[in-house]
Structure formats: structure tokens, C-alpha cells
């Protein structure tokens, strides 16, 4: 059996390790193996508490430097390796260790530790994939790697989860392409898409590969829908589907997907692409008719102006000065919409509509030109003189062309055209087309026809030729020409204009032509409308496809102890009718922000950076109705340190959980298609030693269990550091420290490490340099190694001299890394303050300054 629980006959050499050579020395093995097992529950509790405390220190150490480098990650990995050795069954600590080793660039360690993680969580398909991929990559030859992939994709891998095999198939496909085997690439890529519909990378690659090799619009749409199935909320894919449908004349389906794209943009709070907005309006024109489009565009802007006028009147009545009031005429349609309204009005042929549309369009363009001439506006847009000049030229060309097409203000348009013709940036073909159309509007049809035919297949030139036929009274000829344009350029403004004119002429001529969708457009519409309509519902409400629950798991006693871990149980369920990918950027978002509310007594703690992030990507996907339940460590980091240092009052902790979180005006909120929730609360009472006398604490140090000693040590820290009446005297503090130092050598390794991880070091409390000195001379290398990394603030410390570790490579490397980091003036847990830091800089992450 594999560690992943799959009954496979392993390919020879795939995962095998040399049997004659012991494993390489690692941070978790050198000098760190317990002399004897510790089956005693009390001893296991001490080890677990020490592991958790060390993990907190490692995470805090990383946070002290905004951008940790490989050395920072390596040191954190050494601490986490110690923690994982103390509690080898703690998957949360092991995951942190793997992450740190990855940041340190230790790929071999990531591979080894991932195998360990798979033993703890055999259902973790993300780790399964990583372990198998790493094993295959160990083959030196490409042919060997490809053969290994194929064995996993054959009968030997039949028990692997399909989501894992799908990604292995994709990797194999890419390897085959690298070898020049295009047929093998295509075969394995197809297998990848068939094994797991949520494999978006495979679906996207299949689209790119197969679409480039076919002119079949139906096939391209099917490939696009495959990508949509892999990620139903990818707005770029949704837009691509809308465009594919529109350019093939399948406007019913196109309208649906452009509307879906609009919905996704609104949910994400992003503006629609301007080109997509224009395309959506063309589809609107084609599905609802030119007159409907004109009426709704006009109503929208007129309603906007009416509301602006009402606001103006209300402000005026309130005494606002006239020059500060909004101008209703400043409310304009975008230039692209103005253009379409002019074209639709021309296509309909109503003179009053054309006059109004052209007048509005000219006013919009003139206002745009005036705005861009304002120097402040140019600075806001980052436009230089050249960019401004080009903007003015483009706007003039837009106005000139539409006036010519509409047959309005031809003399003014002719003057502007002459000016445009002299501009080097103006395309000569645009000039030729506009000159030909100007001749159409002036009745010079023969000359115009000659010039337009020279432009060959340009759509607007073809529209001009159809217009000439219409003006000559050749209705059926014009009708056929318009239909040809509409079929050749569906979804474009020219195609929309041509189809509208064709429909009008066909009706006038007694319907000699049957105007309907092409066979291809009908098939595409059927495919598009066959996509289940609950897809849009999923986008609008995450409750349509997932449920998320999170609860703090209460300890057996019902209340947290001072050194207990805070565990949150998370349940994520796919409630949709389709498989959904799980991950940080997948439909089921795996990133959770845990925002705690901590009440100490009756006061709510206000402290920055209490929140933490967890990633629950233990699966590549969840099938319909499948639920994943996992436990995550909720108190690793700032909250854990707060629980350790606050002893005299009871603490209540609850969390707000934000899935796929994002920042909005300085506040965190759940991301698009994501959920948020509030957990239950858990109570941690005040410490039993919070108000103990110095003699009582000294007695615990002398006779107490390791857990009692640790809790009493925290109480000592609290009472020595406080400024209140409960503060111990200097003599009492000295006596307590003496007692603790007497007990320290007699504690187990776990007990020593627990104390070293929870007590302040000498940077935070000067008197602790005595403990640090004892610890750096301890006979246990693991105790010394942790002391090096977490408690020694000076490069001249005895344990940081490489000369002390001749023959012990790991200890020497650790000493060198810590010493170099200190010399580089990096903030560390052992030395969180640097010269020049403010006096109130915390002495440890998220902790109060030392008293």
C-alpha cells in the first residue's frame, strides 16, 4: 500500500531509497531523537505544549521581517523541525514546516516531509499529487519520467483519485510535447480533461491547442464550455463565450453570456471592459431590435439628467450657489454608446431620431475634447502633449465619420475631413472611405462606387455599396448585399446596421428573402442555452453551491487551559450539482481569514495583527454533495501569545471567518462567491497561579510537574513585568528565578523547550540572560539549537561560535546562520529591536514592551 492509500505496484526505483545508506541528516533528526518513547499521557501533553509554543515562536520570528529571505525561512524551519519532532503526529505543525522548507529552497526536505504528511492525512490529494510528482521528477531521463507517468495513468494507478491522475496526465502531456510527440501530447491532454472536469489548466490548454487546429465554431464553443465547467466564475472565459457566440451570429446565447459577464463584474466590483460593453450593446441591438436599443439608451440618459435636475433643485432650495450645482447636460452617454445610437438611428431611417442622435453625439465629443484640454485633467490621466493631440484627432475623426454616414452637417464634416487628411496619424484607408461616403451623401454615386470597390472587403465599404444600391432603387440587390455583410460580420456594428437595413428592405419588398439564423448559429445557441441556468444562480449567491461551518472545538474539560491549543473544526461542503475545484483561486476558495474577538475580563482587546490566515486546500476538488471536515490551529501566532501572557483575567475568544477575503476601505470582507460566519466562543479562565505568592510559585518550581512549572513560570513573568500592586519585589523575583534555574537542569527535554518557548528572552527581560546562559550550555543539542535561534541576541554568544561545533554540521550551520543574521541587523525573535527603533517597539511580536 502507498502512503496515499492506493493499492499500487510501485514502478521499480520510482520511490525507492538506497537501503545501504542512512537518510541524510536533517533538522528533525540530528541530535533530536528522544532517548526513549514517551507513552505517558502527561509527557505527551508536555511535548505537545512545547511543540505548539515553539511553532508560535517560529511564526513570530518570520513576521518580524516584512519580506523574509531564504535564511529567515531556514531558521524558522529548524524551529518548526524541532516542534515536529516533539509532536510528530501534529499535521498543522508539519504543514508549517513544509511551507518554511519551501521558502528556504529545500526541495528535498519538502519532498521528505510531504511523504510524512501523507501518512498523517492519506486523503490529502494535494499532497498526494506533490509526492508522486516529486518522485517522478527524480528520474534523470525524460523517457523515464514519461514512462513513470504512464504507469500511474494505466492500471497501476487505477486506485488513485481521478483528480490526481488528471493532473499527472497533464504533466505527462507537457512532457510528451517537450519530446516532440504531438500525438502523445493530445492523447494525454484529452485524458486529463476527461478524468477531472475541474482541471482548469488542462481545459485551458485543450482550448488553446485544439481551437488553433480547427475552424469549427461548435467545437471551439464546446472547448470554452469545458473551461467554464472547470471554473464557472471565470469572467474572462464567460466573456470569451459571449464573443464566440456573437461573432457567429448566435445572439440569443450571446446575450445570456454577456449578461452573465456583467453580473460577475458587478459581484467583483470591477468595471466592465469598455470593448465588452460596446459588444454587449451590439448584442442588445441584435436581440431586441434597433428601435428598442435607441429607446432604452435615450431613456437611460434622459432619466439620469432628470434626476440630476431634481438634485440641482433640491440643492438650490437649500441655498447652494448656482455655480456649484450639477449641470444636467454634463451627464453624457459614453462615446461608444453614442456611436451605436447614431448607427441604429440611421439604420431605422427616422430623420428626427438621426438629428437627435447626431446632435447628442457631437455634444458629447465636444465636451470630451474640452475636458481633455484642461491641464489638471491631463495630469490626472498621465497624458502628455502627444497623447492629448492624438485624442483630439481621434475624437474629430469619430465626429466626422458619423456626420458623413448620417448625412448631417456635410460641409462642416468636409472641412474636418480635409484637416484629418493632413494629419500623419490618420489612416489613408479611413480617409478614402470617408471621402467615398461623402460623395454618396452628395449624390455622386458612380464616383463613390469606384472608390469603395477599391477598398475591397472592408465591411464599412461594403455597407456603402449596399447603400448605393438602395439609393438607386435596387431594393433586392441592396437587400442581398446587406444580408451578405450581416453574415460575414455578425456581432459587429456594421453587421448590426446591415441586418437592420436588410429586415426593413425585406419587409418593404414583400419578404422575398427568409432572414433567419444560420445552421451554425442555431447549433451554437442550442449549446449555449443548454448550459444549466443554475450556473448564474451560483455566481449570485455562494449558498447555491457551498456551505461553510467553523466551530472552536472545546477541550474535554469544557474550558481552555493556559497552555492548551485552540482548535477550530472547519466543514466545507459542495452543495452544487457539479464537481468544483478547491484552492486559493478556485470556485471553492480555500483561503480563510480568522479574525478573533478577544475579551479579557470585560474589555475587548484592541491589538493589530491578531488575525491569521489558514489554507484548507486538502483536496483538489469536491464532488457534488461531498463534505470535507478538517481541524486547523486557530491560535498559532499572535492570539496564542496573547493567551500565554494574559493570566489574571478570564479570556473569551470567538472568531469571524472570512472565506477568500479581501480588503475594502481598510476593512476585511469575504471575497466574491465566498462566505463569512461567526464561530462559537470558548472560555479560558484565569490561571490558578495568577495571584499566587512568591513562596507558592517557588514551591511549584521545586516540586511541580513540567506543565505546572510552565504555568507558574508564566505567572512569574506576569508578576515581574507588571506595574500594578501585585508586582513582585526585586528580592522575590530573584528568588523565583533562582528556584527556576535550580529546576531547569532536571526537566525533560520537552519541559526545558516548553519553558524556553514561553518565557521572555533577555531582550525582553534582562534578568532572563541567566536562563539563556544555562540553556546555551545544556547537554541536549536540541535545547541548545532552539536557544541559539530564539534566545541569543548577540553574535558573541558562546553557542553561536562555529568552533564549538566541529564535527556537528547542523549545529555549526545553525550557529553561522543565526550569527550572520544578527550581524546583518535583521530583526529576530531573540532581538526584535534594532538601534533607532522607537522606545515602544514591542519586545516580541504582538506583545507589550518589556517593563
Task: Name these PLM-found stretches.
Residues 577-627:
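The feature marks short-to-medium sequence segments in extracytoplasmic or secretory-pathway proteins
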Residues 503-562, 693:
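Low-complexity, acidic Ser/Thr/Pro/Gly-rich terminal tails and inter-domain linkers that flank the onset
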Residues 14-96, 103, 107, 112, ...:
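N-terminal leader/linker segments that initiate helical-solenoid repeat arrays
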Residues 96-103, 130-134, 171-175, 205-212, ...:
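Structural detector for internal amphipathic alpha-helices that build alpha-solenoid repeat scaffolds
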Amino acid at each position: 500500500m502507498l502512503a496515499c492509500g492506493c493499492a499500487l505496484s510501485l514502478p521499480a526505483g520510482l520511490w525507492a531509497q538506497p537501503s545501504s545508506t542512512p537518510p541524510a541528516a536533517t533538522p528533525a533528526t540530528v541530535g533530536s531523537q528522544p532517548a526513549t518513547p514517551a507513552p505517558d499521557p502527561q509527557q505527551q501533553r508536555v511535548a505537545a505544549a512545547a511543540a505548539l509554543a515553539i511553532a508560535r515562536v517560529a511564526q513570530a520570528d518570520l513576521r518580524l521581517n516584512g519580506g523574509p529571505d531564504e535564511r529567515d525561512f531556514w531558521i524558522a524551519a529548524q524551529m518548526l523541525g524541532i516542534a515536529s519532532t516533539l509532536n510528530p503526529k501534529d499535521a498543522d505543525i508539519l504543514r508549517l514546516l513544509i511551507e518554511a522548507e519551501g521558502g528556504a529552497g529545500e526541495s528535498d526536505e519538502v519532498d521528505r516531509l510531504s511523504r510524512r504528511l501523507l501518512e498523517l492525512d492519506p486523503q490529502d490529494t494535494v499532497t498526494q499529487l506533490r509526492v508522486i510528482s516529486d518522485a517522478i521528477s527524480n528520474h534523470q531521463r525524460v523517457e523515464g519520467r514519461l514512462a513513470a507517468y504512464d504507469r500511474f495513468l494505466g492500471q497501476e494507478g487505477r486506485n488513485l483519485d481521478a483528480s490526481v491522475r488528471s493532473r499527472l496526465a497533464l504533466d505527462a502531456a507537457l512532457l510528451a510535447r517537450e519530446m516532440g510527440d504531438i500525438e502523445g501530447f493530445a492523447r494525454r491532454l484529452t485524458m486529463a480533461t476527461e478524468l477531472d472536469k475541474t482541471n482548469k489548466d488542462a481545459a485551458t490548454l485543450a482550448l488553446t491547442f485544439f481551437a488553433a487546429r480547427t475552424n469549427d465554431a461548435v467545437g471551439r464553443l464546446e472547448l470554452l464550455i469545458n473551461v467554464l465547467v472547470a471554473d464557472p466564475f471565470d469572467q474572462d472565459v464567460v466573456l470569451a463565450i459571449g464573443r464566440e457566440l456573437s461573432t457567429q451570429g448566435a445572439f440569443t446565447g450571446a446575450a445570456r453570456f454577456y449578461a452573465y459577464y456583467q453580473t460577475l463584474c458587478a459581484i467583483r466590483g470591477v468595471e466592465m471592459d469598455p470593448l465588452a460593453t460596446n459588444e454587449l450593446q451590439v448584442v442588445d441591438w441584435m436581440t431586441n431590435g434597433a428601435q428598442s436599443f435607441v429607446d432604452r439608451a435615450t431613456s437611460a440618459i434622459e432619466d439620469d439628467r432628470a434626476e440630476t435636475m431634481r438634485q440641482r433643485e433640491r440643492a438650490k432650495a437649500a441655498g447652494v450657489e448656482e455655480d456649484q450645482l450639477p449641470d444636467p447636460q454634463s451627464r453624457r452617454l459614453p462615446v461608444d454608446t453614442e456611436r451605436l445610437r447614431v448607427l441604429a438611428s440611421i439604420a431605422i431611417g427616422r430623420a428626427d431620431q438621426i438629428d437627435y442622435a447626431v446632435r447628442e453625439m457631437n455634444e458629447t465629443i465636444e465636451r470630451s475634447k474640452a475636458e481633455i484640454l484642461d491641464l489638471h485633467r491631463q495630469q490626472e490621466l498621465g497624458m502628455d502633449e502627444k497623447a492629448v493631440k492624438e485624442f483630439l484627432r481621434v475624437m474629430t475623426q469619430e465626429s466626422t465619420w458619423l456626420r458623413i454616414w448620417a448625412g448631417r452637417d456635410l460641409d462642416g464634416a468636409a472641412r474636418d475631413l480635409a484637416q484629418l487628411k493632413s494629419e500623419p496619424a490618420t489612416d489613408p484607408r479611413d480617409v478614402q472611405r470617408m471621402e467615398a461616403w461623402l460623395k454618396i451623401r452628395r449624390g455622386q454615386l458612380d464616383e463613390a462606387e469606384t472608390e469603395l470597390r477599391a477598398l475591397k472587403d472592408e465591411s464599412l465599404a461594403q455597407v456603402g455599396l449596399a447603400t448605393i444600391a438602395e439609393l438607386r432603387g435596387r431594393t433586392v440587390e441592396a437587400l442581398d448585399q446587406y444580408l451578405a455583410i450581416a453574415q460575414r460580420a455578425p456581432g459587429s456594428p456594421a453587421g448590426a446596421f446591415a441586418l437592420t437595413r436588410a429586415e426593413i428592405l425585406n419587409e418593404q419588398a414583400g419578404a422575398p428573402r427568409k432572414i433567419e439564423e444560420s445552421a451554425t448559429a442555431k447549433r451554437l445557441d442550442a449549446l449555449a442555452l443548454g448550459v444549466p441556468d443554475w450556473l448564474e444562480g451560483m455566481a449570485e449567491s455562494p449558498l447555491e453551491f457551498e456551505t461553510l461551518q467553523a466551530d472552536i472545538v472545546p477541550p474535554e474539560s469544557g474550558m481552555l487551559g493556559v497552555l492548551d491549543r485552540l482548535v477550530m473544526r472547519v466543514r466545507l461542503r459542495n452543495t452544487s450539482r457539479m464537481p468544483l475545484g478547491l484552492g486559493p483561486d478556485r470556485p471553492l476558495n480555500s483561503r480563510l481569514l480568522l479574525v478573533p474577538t478577544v475579551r479579557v475580563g470585560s474589555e475587548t482587546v484592541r491589538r493589530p495583527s491578531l488575525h491569521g490566515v489558514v489554507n484548507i486546500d486538502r483536496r483538489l476538488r469536491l464532488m457534488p454533495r461531498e463534505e470535507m471536515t478538517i481541524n486547523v490551529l486557530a491560535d498559532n501566532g499572535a492570539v496564542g501569545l496573547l493567551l500565554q501572557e494574559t493570566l489574571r483575567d478570564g479570556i473569551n475568544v470567538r472568531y469571524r471567518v472570512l472565506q477568500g477575503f479581501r480588503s475594502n476601505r481598510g476593512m476585511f470582507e469575504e471575497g466574491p462567491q465566498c462566505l463569512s460566519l461567526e464561530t462559537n466562543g470558548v472560555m479560558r479562565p484565569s490561571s490558578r497561579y495568577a495571584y499566587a505568592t512568591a513562596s507558592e510559585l517557588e514551591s511549584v518550581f521545586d516540586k511541580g510537574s513540567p506543565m505546572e512549572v510552565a504555568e507558574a513560570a508564566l505567572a512569574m513573568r506576569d508578576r515581574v513585568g507588571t506595574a500594578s500592586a501585585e508586582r513582585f519585589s526585586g528580592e522575590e523575583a530573584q528568588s523565583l528565578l533562582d528556584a527556576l534555574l535550580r529546576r531547569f537542569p532536571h526537566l525533560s527535554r520537552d519541559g526545558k523547550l516548553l519553558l524556553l518557548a514561553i518565557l521572555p528572552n533577555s531582550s525582553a527581560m534582562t534578568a532572563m540572560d541567566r536562563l539563556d546562559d544555562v540553556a546555551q550550555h545544556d547537554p541536549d543539542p536540541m535545547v541548545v539549537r532552539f536557544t541559539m535561534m530564539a534566545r541569543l541576541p548577540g553574535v558573541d554568544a558562546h553557542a553561536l561560535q562555529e568552533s564549538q561545533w566541529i564535527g556537528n554540521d547542523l549545529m555549526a550551520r545553525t550557529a553561522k546562520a543565526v550569527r550572520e543574521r544578527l550581524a546583518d541587523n535583521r530583526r529576530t525573535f531573540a532581538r526584535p529591536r534594532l538601534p533607532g527603533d522607537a522606545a515602544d517597539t514591542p519586545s516580541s511580536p504582538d506583545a507589550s514592551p518589556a517593563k
